[in-house]
Amino acid sequence: MNWRKLLMGGGAAVGAAAAFNHLASRDVGPLENLIGGTEGWFEWRGHRVAYTRRGQGPAVLLVHGVHAAASSYEWRQNVEPLALAHTVFTIDLLGFGRSDRPTLRYTTALFLGLLSDFVRQVVAAPCAIVASSLSGAYAIVLGARDPGRFPALVLVGPTGIMRLNRNARASGDFARIAVDTPVVGTAVYNGLVTHRSIRAFLETSYADDALVTDAMVDVYYRAAHQPGAKHAPAAFVGQQLNIDVRDALRRLVQPALLAWGEQARMAPVEEMRSFLSLKPDFEPVIFSPAGDLPHDERPDEFNEVVSGFLAKAEQEETARG
């Protein structure tokens, strides 16, 4: 074997990967706050976590789902209506959105700690959680641990029973390390979050794919290409963020609304039954036509249902004293 040729070929491949990475991130500016409200920064473990605050009343925290292009932009059609009667907080999880994206080991425990500390230190009051997908699983665990701090839950297509419930295996850790590898791993990541692939992901997420606009794709693309953007998604791919919620579900005592889109594809509505079997007193609601993001696809209906649910939960809490 001609080692010189092999090394030259490897160097060329790395060079090509570096060039591809440069093109993928070229002209990608920082993310703006596109949901309004007062912007804030939570200094947490040496990193800055972005959040917004809007309105007055009982506190509500909106937590976005977990994927390569995730951010609180997901809640852009819900913040203002819910803030009519509540103090509404949104948060960009560490590694996502406008928050810092440090090179570190992202885990379920990290995000549970972040959310718990944020509510304790920033919200500083009992706080209902509205969370989607994998973050819905985190909300379940937090609610089971501390029902006084989290007096009501709204879970949108949560995971933790049939999906994203298994602990990381060796193959998952290998996938995380592969994506986290400099240059080549970054090229793999950038190849997965092109404009085309993000559009396809969004079109799969909505029952009506005509709702996916070029402007929306651009926001998600920029979210997926901020400096350090690959680290948290690498942990997701590596199954480091999974959590089994079955035990926590059985221990929930606070009011909980379970929301689903009837045409959801990534989290089919049939999965709702597995949650209801473990917690029959869930208040279930199915939005149609809607896919995996019913809060964005049917915002008026979603906001009305959630506002009514929260008002009822708050009245019951007041009556209990």
Where are these regions (language model features)?
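Catalytic active-site module of serine/aspartate enzymes centered on a nucleophile-bearing elbow/loop
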Residues: 280-321
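Conserved hydrolase catalytic core segment
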Residues: 125-168
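Conserved HGGG/HGGXW glycine-rich cap/lid loop of the alpha/beta-hydrolase fold
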Residues: 52-98
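Alpha/beta-hydrolase fold catalytic core
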Residues: 1-60, 84-86, 125, 311-321
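Alpha/beta-hydrolase active-site loop signature
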Residues: 67, 93-97, 160, 265, ...
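Conserved alpha/beta-hydrolase catalytic His-Asp/Glu region
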Residues: 165-167, 189-250
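Active-site loop/oxyanion-hole signature of alpha/beta-hydrolase fold enzymes
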Residues: 80, 89-130, 295, 304
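Conserved loop-alpha-helix segment in the C-terminal half of the alpha/beta-hydrolase fold
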Residues: 251-290
